[in-house]
């Protein structure tokens, strides 16, 4: 339902891992990238987030993504280690809670292998956002072996932001092909990331 407010509780929440600004960026941008929907997020000082659906389709029933993987909510292909099945259905509240939990899992992985994005570094909110957004899309293991991660750990923020761009391909019929959707997403992540390089 549009305009319903959902509270995301801080239970060692996202803001504790990546900071308030990065958590807000993730909770606003991931639904836009994954589902095309618009949400409004208000962050409390304790890290609790109030998420309000404004517009756009919500995928409460599972669907097949561009490469045929069952997906639900805001890009979830699994939850608590269980793959999403095409028959799965969720409520809006479940989707919001699941998104926050999955972002926490991905953020922890990113922060563990990327000490160059530690909260003690100033002006890293946008780079942290880009790193977690990419990891949410391609997996933590891929992030941790990426050139972007190596650049961020070396405090080469611009180079790290630029290294996001090659992650624009999907596998179709056994071949890697550029996805216009992923190319656009990587460009948007890079643009946000570069705000820390200025």
Where do the language-model regions lie?
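Long, amphipathic alpha-helical surface segments
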Residues: 2-21, 25-29, 54, 59, ...
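Export/targeting segments at the very N-terminus of extracytoplasmic proteins
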Residues: 2-32, 96, 100-122
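Short, functionally critical alpha-helical segments immediately adjacent to catalytic or ligand/cofactor-binding
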Residues: 27-38, 50, 128-135
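Structural recognition of the beta-strand scaffold that forms the well-ordered cores
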Residues: 29, 71-73, 130-135, 159-163
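Short, charged/polar N-terminal "headpieces" of proteins
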Residues: 35-48, 60
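Substrate-binding/active-site groove segments that recognize
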Residues: 49-84
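Extracellular/periplasmic catalytic domains that process cell-envelope and extracellular macromolecules
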Residues: 63-66, 123-127, 153-154
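Alpha-helical segment that forms one wall of the substrate-binding/catalytic cleft
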Residues: 82-118, 124-145, 149, 157, ...
């Amino acid at each position: 339902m549009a305009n319903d407010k959902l509270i995301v509780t801080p239970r060692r929440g996202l803001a504790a891992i990546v900071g308030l600004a990065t958590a807000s960026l993730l909770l606003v941008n991931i639904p836009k990238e994954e589902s095309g929907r618009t949400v409004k997020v208000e962050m409390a000082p304790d890290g609790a987030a109030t998420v309000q659906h404004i517009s756009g389709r919500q995928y409460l029933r599972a669907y097949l993504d561009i490469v045929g993987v069952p997906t639900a909510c805001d890009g979830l292909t699994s939850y608590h280690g269980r793959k999403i099945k095409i028959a799965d259905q969720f409520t809006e509240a479940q989707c919001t809670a699941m998104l926050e939990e999955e972002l926490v899992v991905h953020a922890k992985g990113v922060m563990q292998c990327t000490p160059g994005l530690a909260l003690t570094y100033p002006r890293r909110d946008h780079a942290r956002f880009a790193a977690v957004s990419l990891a949410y899309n391609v997996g933590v293991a891929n992030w941790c072996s990426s050139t972007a991660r190596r650049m961020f750990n070396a405090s080469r923020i611009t180079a790290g932001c630029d290294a996001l761009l090659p992650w624009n391909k999907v596998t179709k019929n056994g071949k890697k092909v550029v996805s216009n959707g992923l190319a656009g997403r990587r460009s948007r992540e890079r643009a946000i990331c570069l705000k820390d390089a200025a």
